[in-house]
């Protein structure tokens, strides 16, 4: 499935600084003193939310009660560089299973690490994660501290998608015998589906759904087209939005709009577009350092309808994209005046936008339009 927006791709490469001033929003600080929070997930029935802290703690936040003590039973994480405790997601059947999924950096035997994913049962009193089971390990373990990815998305059809970085080992994103630089697809129990694209490909990892990805930091289901969307960090320039489809190659490091941090070209790169690879849906020439993303699919604030919100770590704001089907038509910014790295963005069951800032004194923010 190709995107009509690609016809006007050069128009999408304009620097973000050329867009209009940030829209006015109202911001409430719900929690201070979060030590590098990474992700949040809403619990049902007004029970608050779960928040991961990069250092390895999972906590519960409730209105009027604040932050809990650390939840017991979280696996040991490799807290180094960009590694640590990463995403959190509730199983689709959480109401009966109480299953909570986590992604995290896991140490290997040689001082390197990779992304691992597993789940446990959240106790009825929300204080313990019981019988934690690891169902996925990124192999081989290659990271010395970079590019873990780690976002978790259930598609509503019985499958879990995991975004995986290439551990700063560029060529591995093209290697089908390695799990670096991939999107993988599992069942809701952690098994490999029989219809994954490379199940019958000799020496390929059967978990792989798509490949050629650098460092995905945000991932979400588009509720209007029912497609998986992913954002990923480019190197120096070339942050992208992609729609990872079955068996397709998204180019890294062969195709990129970025260069090395040194200013030199990426050695493996053959151009911005390369035959046999998928062009991105949207590209930033100047990298915002994209992070968590959320589609606004609520009727609470009509002015936000059909918007996609993406956090930006380097630019320290939230990017707002207007979405029509599988195309992006316009961009704006909010929260830039706060000067905080934005790590995660979620739409709450109440229709408000919830934002985590990635600082040693990180915050949980509740955001709404200034004119509700």
Map each language-model feature to its residues.
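Conserved blade-ending motifs and adjacent loop-strand segments that build the rim/top face
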Residues: 213, 328-349
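Bacterial N-terminal signal peptides
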Residues: 8-17
């Amino acid at each position: 499935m190709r995107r009509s927006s690609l016809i006007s791709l050069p128009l999408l490469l304009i620097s973000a600084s050329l867009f209009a001033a940030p829209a006015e929003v109202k911001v409430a600080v719900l929690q201070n003193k979060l030590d590098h929070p990474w992700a949040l997930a809403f619990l049902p029935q007004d029970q608050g939310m779960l928040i991961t802290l990069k250092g390895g703690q999972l906590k519960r936040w409730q209105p009027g009660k604040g932050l809990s003590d650390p939840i017991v039973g979280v696996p040991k994480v490799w807290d180094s560089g960009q590694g640590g405790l990463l995403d959190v997601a509730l199983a689709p059947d959480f109401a009966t299973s109480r299953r909570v999924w986590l992604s995290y950096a896991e140490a290997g035997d040689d001082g390197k690490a990779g992304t691992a994913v597993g789940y446990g049962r959240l106790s009825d009193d929300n204080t313990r994660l019981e019988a934690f089971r690891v169902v996925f390990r990124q192999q081989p373990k290659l990271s010395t501290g970079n590019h873990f990815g780690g976002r978790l998305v259930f598609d509503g059809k019985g499958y879990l998608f995991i975004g995986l970085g290439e551990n700063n080992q560029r060529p591995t994103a093209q290697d089908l015998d390695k799990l670096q630089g991939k999107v993988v697809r599992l069942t809701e129990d952690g098994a490999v589906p029989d219809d994954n694209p490379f199940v019958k490909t000799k020496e390929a990892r059967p978990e792989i759904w798509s490949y050629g990805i650098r460092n995905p930091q945000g991932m979400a289901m588009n509720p209007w087209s029912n497609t998986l969307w992913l954002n990923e960090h480019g190197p120096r320039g070339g942050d992208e939005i992609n729609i990872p489809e079955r068996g397709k190659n998204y180019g890294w490091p062969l195709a990129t709009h970025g260069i090395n941090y040194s200013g030199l070209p990426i050695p493996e790169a053959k151009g911005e577009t390369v035959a046999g690879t998928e062009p991105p849906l949207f590209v930033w020439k100047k990298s915002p350092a994209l992070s968590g993303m959320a589609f606004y699919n609520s009727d609470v604030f009509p002015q936000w309808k059909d918007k996609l919100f993406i956090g930006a770590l380097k630019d320290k704001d939230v990017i707002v994209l207007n979405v029509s089907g599988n195309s992006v038509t316009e961009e704006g910014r909010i929260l830039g005046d706060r000067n905080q790295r934005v790590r995660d963005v979620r739409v709450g069951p109440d229709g408000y936008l919830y934002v985590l800032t990635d600082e040693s004194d990180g915050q949980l923010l509740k955001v709404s339009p200034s004119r509700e």
